[in-house]
Amino acid sequence: MTQQGAALQNYNNELVKCIEELCQKREELCRQIQQEEDEKQRLQNEVRQLTEKLARVNENLARKIASRNEFDRTIAETEAAYLKILESSQTLLSVLKREAGNLTKATASDQKSSGGKDS
């Protein structure tokens, strides 16, 4: 009976030891879980902040692209109008030179036909 009692005591000691080891492993696992939950929370906060920042950057970018497009449109319209002004100026200059030439010829013809009698 003493052998059975000793064996039972031995089993009991091993059971207690195994339970203590399991409790220690559980505590370590709980510590790791808490660390990872903290890390998860930190990462979620970073993602939220980055998402908000990305939204602000996208809004700013959209406004700036719209402004650039407006600049492009204004520049294109202004350049087209300026080219029309240049063409009109060239046409006006050609007409003016032609008319001045015609007037010069007409004046020269008038002076020849009058023969300088007015003097």
Curated annotation (Swiss-Prot):
Function: Microtubule-binding protein which stabilizes dynamic microtubules by slowing growth and shrinkage at both plus and minus ends and serves as a sensor of microtubule damage, protecting microtubules from the microtubule-severing enzyme SPAST. Induces microtubule branching which is mediated by the formation of long SSNA1 fibrils which guide microtubule protofilaments to split apart from the mother microtubule and form daughter microtubules. Plays a role in axon outgrowth and branching. Required for cell division.
Quaternary structure annotation from Swiss-Prot or TrEMBL: Self-associates to form fibrils. Also forms dimers as well as monomers. Interacts with SPAST.
UniProt protein name: Microtubule nucleation factor SSNA1
Gene: Ssna1
GO CC annotation: axon; axoneme; centriole; centrosome; ciliary basal body; midbody; motile cilium; nucleus
Record GO terms (molecular function): identical protein binding; microtubule binding
Subcellular location(s) of the protein: Nucleus; Cytoplasm, Cytoskeleton, Microtubule organizing center, Centrosome; Cytoplasm, Cytoskeleton, Microtubule organizing center, Centrosome, Centriole; Midbody
Entry keywords, A to Z: Acetylation, Cell cycle, Cell division, Cell projection, Cilium, Coiled coil, Cytoplasm, Cytoskeleton, Flagellum, Neurogenesis, Nucleus
GO biological process, one term: intraciliary transport
Region described as Important for localization to the centrosome: spans on this chain: 2-32
Coiled-coil region(s): 13-70
Lineage of the species this protein comes from: Eukaryota, Metazoa, Chordata, Craniata, Vertebrata
Family in the record: Belongs to the SSNA1 family.
Record PTM N-acetylthreonine, positions in chain: 2
InterPro entries with a match to the protein in the record: SSNA1_fam (IPR033362)
